[in-house]
Structure formats: structure tokens, C-alpha cells
Amino acid sequence: MTSEQETSQTNRLEQASPCAIATKGLTKTLGSTKVVDQVSLEVPTSSIYGFLGPNGSGKTTTIRMLLGLVAPDAGEVEILGASEPKHRQLRLSRVGAVVEGPGFYPYLSGFDNLKRFAQIAFPAQRKANPTIMKLSGAEISSRLEQVGLLDAKNKAYRAYSLGMKQRLAIAAALLWQRDLLVLDEPTNGLDPQGIVEVRDLLTSLNQSGLTIFISSHILSEVEIICSDVGIMRDGRLMFQGSTKAFRSSFGEEFIVETADPGLAKSVLLQFGFAEPDSIQIQAKRLTATLTTDEIERVVAALVNGGVGIRAVARSSPSLEDAFVALTGRSGHAR
């Protein structure tokens, strides 16, 4: 089969798949410990997917298997629609990744670092995909512009802020055309300004059609930018779906401000809109987990029941609240 035929076949596979990453029963044992156990990921194309889990949950090993750095003991990996090893290698040439801390030369400029990186990486890129060409200086400058570093292209790497260094690493991962970007802790160690810079960059890249897979422990950032999440615990995938669905799965609270919360409770129980143990009353506020999504019916029943309503609100748990409820771990995910 010629390289053009291989490219055509993997393109057809990609078009048939709604997922940029799909695994089935992915399993890996290190020593006597099963660190990844029957993990089946589905990362929607064009999504920003947050991959979360406590320390030792198997995230890093999973990422290494996705990128072909570690061989699984069992299971299947499909990247950009290609599952067979030969085709997957070709598709991996369309995947950019920043898994370890970026290794750049401190006294070289951002431009010269990317130029050097492109020279070193080109043979492997060309071997995986014969259609890939060497990059010109203008193309390297274009990548720097893409990550907002064009004005700093001649500044030495050692003079870059942490946020700038991370953006340069992302530029290196995007030197050639990519359909998928895999990032391990992209905002780790950054100050608030650096976090905002990287967040804005990832949002912009995603809007251009790039699928982004992020492993992160900063849950507040994941909640802001990720459309989908996967939650790992003890090597198993405990949840996978939209960020909104994950939060909602742990209950959405219905809040009523009223002068008579006792009457409001009676009405909710009368119509079966809430279970008794889900209702809490504090001063003039009633909070309940409803058994229905039809808020209009609930409000109408309260009004018809004589409840004087001052305010009504709905509140979903934060991503961190839901994460703690699922994993039993407080603080940062790892």
C-alpha cells in the first residue's frame, strides 16, 4: 500500500469516527499493581476534554499508552479514527503533545528554540507521515504568532515568564498540522496571569477546530474551559461525559426565598417534588433536591399553595464538589 493510499484510508477512518480518542478495555499492570483497569475513553472530536483523578489513579500511564509511549497489556486504542498500529502511527503524526516539562535552550531565543526543535523532530515526523515538509522561518514565526509570542520571538527563553514558556511548548507541539493536542498539567506552577494566558490560548485553538485533551489538577480551570471530563480512580474510569452532566449527576439544588419555608416544604412534599430528607430550611430560605426538572410546575404549585415567593434559584454543585463526592478526595485532583 502506498503512503497516499494509507493516508486516504486513515482519513476515511477518521471521518467515520465521532471521537478523536477512543479506547476499549485499556489495561496496564506495573509489577503487581493494575494501574489502568478496563478504561474505555470517548473523547469527542473538537472538544476540550479534562482528564482528572487523584494521585496514582492511572492518568499518566493512560496518556502514555494513548501516545504510544507505553504498550498496553490489553485493550484497543483508536486515535483520530485509526486503530491498526500502522495507521495509528500515521495519525499520531497529527497529534501534538506536551507531557513532560518542555526542554528548551535557555540562552536561545524563542524563535531559535522552535527552529532547533523543528530540525530535530523532522526526521521522525517525516517517517510517520511522508507528506510532512520542513518548516520555513515564516512558518515558525506563524506558530509563534498563533500562541501570542511573535513580539517576543527574539527574546531569550530564560527571560520568558512561566506562562510564555508554556505557550512556547504548545507552539512546539503545533509546529506541524495537528488535529489533537494532548497536554499534561498545562497550567501547573503558573501564576494567575499565566493561567489566564494559557486558558485563552487553548480556548482559541479549540475554536479553530482542534481537539484538546488535558490532564489537570486545577479543577476551577477545568470547569471553565472543558466541555467534557473523564474521572479516574484506582485505575478505573468512574465517570465520562459532559462537564455539565457530571455536576448535575450529583444533584441540582432548588432554592426558595420565602417568609414561610415550612409551608413551602409542605407543598413540595404534597406534590412529590422532593423527598423529605432532601429539604433543608435556614431562616427564610428553603433548599431542596427536586425529583423533576419542570421548575415552572414547582413554582406554580408553590404559588397556588399560598407560598409568598421572594426569589427562586437553581444551583448545581461545582466541579470540585462533584469530584470530591465521586472520589472521596478533597483539595486538588492529581
What are the roles of these predicted feature ranges?
Residues 1-27, 329-334:
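ABC-family P-loop ATPase nucleotide-binding domain
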Residues 18-23, 28-214, 219-233, 239:
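ABC transporter nucleotide-binding domains
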Residues 45, 122, 151, 260, ...:
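Non-catalytic surface loops within mature trypsin-like serine protease
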Residues 230, 325-328:
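Short low-complexity, flexible loop/linker segments enriched in glycine and/or proline
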Residues 237-242, 270-274:
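Short amphipathic beta-strand starts and helix->beta connectors
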Residues 244-248:
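Short acidic-hydrophobic catalytic motif
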